[in-house]
A protein has these predicted regions:
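Acidic, low-complexity Ser/Thr/Gly/Pro-rich repeat segments typical of extracellular/periplasmic
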Residues: 121-410, 415-439
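Short proline/glycine- and polar residue-rich coil/turn motifs
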Residues: 60-69, 265-270, 472-476
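Domain-level recognition of soluble alpha/beta enzyme cores
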Residues: 386-496, 503
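Cap/lid segment of the alpha/beta-hydrolase catalytic domain
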Residues: 437-438, 442-479, 495-600
Length: 904
């Protein structure tokens, strides 16, 4: 019989200052503190004045059981000097300890009455400054109420969460639209911290041009390695280890810049530009981070420090209660900057924020997944073994494609060169969403239907976990649509493949649908198995027609932004829909049992019931690549995922993407205050995390969320106009991907176009450029092998359409410039800013040459360099190599350019 595990003590500690006054402190040369504990624990006791923790020597004491102890915290020489001056002295005691497995802190402050003997008889009392502040707004950055952001000032203690905190947003303090409607949403306050990929926002007085930015030598997206330069003026500190964290910074260039999306100037001027600071890889769950800006200058002159921050930094007491309450919170901030070796007097501003816990970020969709698969009878999702039943499947239609009459031209309607059959139907999926109501959708019929467009997660009363039961009683389901296609036995051969095929889950792009799965039948080497896809609800075409049009109305100031919650909520339901589709493909009683998927009485595809991952893979493009990263972290039935043109951190991708150009003018018109707009976009990430990889990136490869381990191939299109390269690289860093090298041909990273600043990037000098910092590179020869990746679980390959090629009308037909290093999307030739070339987003994922690298990996044959020459993958001009299945690859003609441009 196994020995019982010892109970973990959950002792609670309190502290009390016993020293009566200043005279007693100076006489004893120590601060007397009483420490009480309700059980066994170890306590580190320290004291500070005005956030200065170097005035007293800390002590650590141990409790073996419940009791109280008195400790003396000796004054240091600087403490005797500072606290020996005339005047009452306010001190704060902090006790740090373990409560169970969680870190806990007890704090207590006291003002020690002054020693009159230290004050001259005629010395007038010192009048304390009393700066003006706004209730519930952080006084250290008064430009806007919720600056700086993210910020633990906007949290409250909550012992029920893993971080010990809960967000405490208030409607009256949050950004508002043109009609004065707050973007407040109660969903924010379900979080126990901020996003691992939050855009960090603050305002630096006078810093509003690229010249003033470069004057300070800030780390930027093109030279991330500068984050740990000894003199770096913007730093992010992980307080767990006092180490700097990789970041990059920029100015919000939207205010005062000609609007590339139409409509002239965006509201605001250069003076409204905030500083935006971005993590270069996902931050760690549940950790506390300190942001610090120091030694800032504009035009060679020091930037003025906000008076409240200066009072806190320099230990100057005020008569303002809100400032003094903030002082207690700032003590840990200054302790972190002290430990990081940053002189306190150099600070322009500093603050702290806590990242949400893994449990908080993942438990909603995890509870949905566990419940959904429990209903099928599979209670162990980590073993790759099928247990229980297949989902309920309905086949609605089948269609046999015609062959193409000419192999060198595009197919006509109802024809496909590579696909033989299309099958459409639905899968019954547990629905964990409510009925949207008319305020969330333009579809009257869908307003009363759970899981319809505009619906949000359905929470049981008093619970933070979604439930399938409407009104607490009736479980509801959703018929998730799917499209599957089965390949031919060869190009234009009028016969269906008969047996032994692999299975592929396909993830479509933004505002598309399950029908996009058919496109796999258009490209050479793309359809190498039975492929099935469902809708990425939340950002599918059904949402565009209903919920997203309603969202546009909201942005147009008819309501507040609480409707946004539906987008990431619906995406999480979409993960469950996709996992059920995968189980329908993997299970022998699923699709394989239907005649439409059989030939001669035998299924045309074969998935091992004891190791599903070797026969089933995931392939997603664009939104499918983004959502595919998150779903792979949750996926029990596939091992390998190919993520084409993916990224993470939607709040950073948003304004950089041409896909959102149709929405942004409406956003700009509804939210006219540039600073509030920047804060609002950053806030969205707190909700959006669960609807993209930010919440799940730490577990994509390692099976940390109760799945088998996974392998991932990331495909980046250099200069992508829809998914900025910087966010694809952020995903690669976050999961530890190795890049296939050489990454780019010489000169490509310097091909900047009209946004070049005297030959440099806007925020970075060309001789400092290193965009792929901290992504290991392995040369091509290390990859050409079967059986998996070369010692890695993740690889990133960068493909390039090459320099811009212009057509007879002068418009670009192929090739692109590098991404500009600002937060505005590349634009087309008829916009107010000259074009940046032809968007490589679609060709980058669908070129025959690229398919030759994506598909063999997906099917378990490892990662291969289809170009075969060890050179960077510039594939813009023909000839393209033929698929690897050919014993002697030879060049083949490219599809007609209009074929790709029209999205076929």
């Amino acid at each position: 019989m196994a020995a019982a595990k010892p109970k973990v003590s959950k002792a609670k500690v309190t502290v009390k200052v016993l020293t009566k006054n200043q005279a007693a402190l100076l006489k004893a040369k120590k601060l007397s503190v009483q420490v009480r504990s309700t059980g066994k624990t170890k306590v580190k006791v320290s004291a500070a004045k005005g956030g200065n923790a170097k005035l007293f020597k800390a002590k650590t004491i141990k409790f073996k059981r419940k009791g109280k102890r008195t400790v003396g915290l000796a004054l240091t020489s600087s403490g005797r000097s500072l606290l020996g001056k005339c005047g009452a002295q306010s001190v704060k005691v902090t006790a740090k300890y373990k409560r169970g497995k969680k870190n806990a802190t007890a704090k207590k402050g006291k003002t020690l009455a002054r020693d009159a003997k230290l004050c001259g008889p005629d010395e007038p009392p010192v009048e304390k400054p009393n700066p003006a502040t706004t209730p519930n707004c952080d006084p250290i950055d008064p430009v806007a109420c919720m600056l700086p952001f993210p910020n633990d000032y906007f949290t409250k203690p909550d012992s029920s969460t893993d971080t010990g905190l809960r967000l405490d947003f208030k409607a009256e303090n949050m950004p508002t639209n043109a009609e004065g409607k707050s973007i407040y949403n109660g969903a924010y306050n379900r979080n126990d911290g901020f996003s691992p990929n939050n855009v960090i926002v603050t305002k630096v007085p006078g810093m509003d041009t690229p010249e003033t930015f470069r004057e300070n030598g800030f780390v930027s997206q093109m030279n991330i390695g500068a984050y740990d330069d000894p003199a770096q003026r913007v730093v992010l500190i992980d307080t767990t280890n006092n180490q700097r964290v990789p970041i990059w910074a920029e100015l919000d260039m939207i205010p005062g810049t000609p609007n590339p999306h139409g409509g002239g100037l965006v509201d605001g001027t250069a003076q409204d530009r905030t500083m935006l600071i971005h993590p270069a890889q996902s931050l760690e769950y549940g950790r506390r981070y300190v942001v610090a800006l120091r030694d800032l200058t504009v035009g060679g002159s020091p930037v003025a420090v906000n008076e409240v921050f200066k009072y806190l930094r320099d230990g100057v007491e005020t008569a303002n209660q809100q400032v003094e309450e903030r002082r207690a919170q700032m003590s840990d901030v200054f302790s972190a900057t002290d430990a990081a070796g940053i002189p306190r007097g150099s600070l322009n501003v500093a603050w702290e924020f806590t990242v949400a816990s893994e449990k908080n970020l993942t438990e909603r969709v995890m509870s949905m997944r566990e419940d959904a698969f429990d209903q099928l009878g599979d209670t162990n999702l980590a073993d790759g073994v099928i247990q229980g039943d297949a989902p309920n499947i309905t086949i609605d239609s089948t269609f046999d494609y015609g062959t193409c009459p000419n192999s060198t031209t595009a197919c006509g309607g109802g024809q496909s060169r590579y696909a033989f059959k299309r099958i459409r139907g639905t899968i019954e999926v547990p629905c964990y969403m409510n009925a949207p109501g008319t305020e969330y959708t333009k579809d009257p019929a869908g307003a009363t239907t759970p899981c319809a467009s505009g619906s949000r997660l359905n929470y049981a009363p008093g619970s933070d976990l979604p439930t399938q039961k409407m009104d607490g009683a009736t479980p509801v389901t959703w018929d998730a649509p799917f499209t599957c296609i089965i390949p031919r036995t060869g190009e234009n051969v009028n016969a269906m493949a008969t047996s032994g095929l692999k299975a592929i889950i396909f993830g479509h792009g933004l505002m598309q649908s399950n029908a996009t799965t058919e496109q796999l039948g258009y490209y050479p080497a793309a359809l190498e198995g039975v492929a099935c896809g469902t809708d990425w609800i939340g950002l599918s075409n059904q949402d565009l027609g209903q919920h997203l049009l309603k969202m546009i109305d909201v942005f147009s100031s008819t309501s507040d932004l609480s409707i946004f919650e539906a987008l990431p909520d619906r995406t999480q339901q979409g993960y469950i829909n996709t996992l059920y589709l995968a189980r329908a493909l993997a299970h022998e009683d699923g699709f394989a049992s239907f005649p439409a998927f059989r030939s001669g009485g035998v299924p045309v595809f074969d998935v091992d019931q004891n190791d599903t991952g070797k026969d089933l893979g995931y392939y997603g493009v664009s939104l499918g690549g983004i959502n595919g990263g998150a779903t792979t972290a949750l996926a029990p039935d596939w091992e390998r995922a190919t993520l084409a043109v993916p990224g993470m951190g939607f709040s950073t991708m948003l304004t950089r993407s041409t896909q959102f150009n149709q929405f942004l003018p409406t956003v700009y018109a509804a939210y006219t205050n540039p600073v509030d707009r920047a804060i609002g976009i950053s806030m969205l990430q707190v909700l959006w995390d669960r609807g993209e990889p930010s919440a799940y990136s730490k577990s994509i490869l390692n099976g940390g969320l109760g799945t088998p381990e996974h392998e991932v191939l990331i495909q980046e299109s250099f200069g992508d106009h829809q998914v900025a390269n910087i966010q694809t690289q952020t995903l690669a860093r976050s999961i530890g991907a190795t890049a296939k090298g050489p990454i780019l041909a010489d000169g490509r990273i310097t091909d900047l176009g009209v946004l070049a600043n005297g030959g440099d990037y806007l925020f970075t000098k060309m001789d400092q450029v290193d965009p792929y910092w901290n992504i290991p590179v392995a040369q091509s020869s290390q990859f050409n092998q079967a059986g998996g990746l070369p010692g890695e679980n993740a690889v990133m390959m960068t493909t390039d359409t090459g320099p811009v090629v212009h057509g007879v009308d002068g418009n670009p037909v192929l090739g692109t410039k590098a991404n500009p290093d600002w937060n505005i999307a590349p634009v087309s030739g008829n916009a107010t800013v000259d074009n940046e070339g032809y968007d490589p987003h679609q060709p980058g994922a669908t070129s025959p040459a690229i398919q030759q690298m994506l598909m063999p990996f997906l099917l378990g044959d490892g990662f291969h360099d289809a170009c075969g020459d060890g050179a960077p993958d510039i594939y813009g001009q023909p000839p393209f190599p033929v698929p690897l299945s050919s014993p002697n690859p030879v060049p083949c003609p490219a599809p007609p350019i209009d074929y790709i441009r029209n999205g076929h």
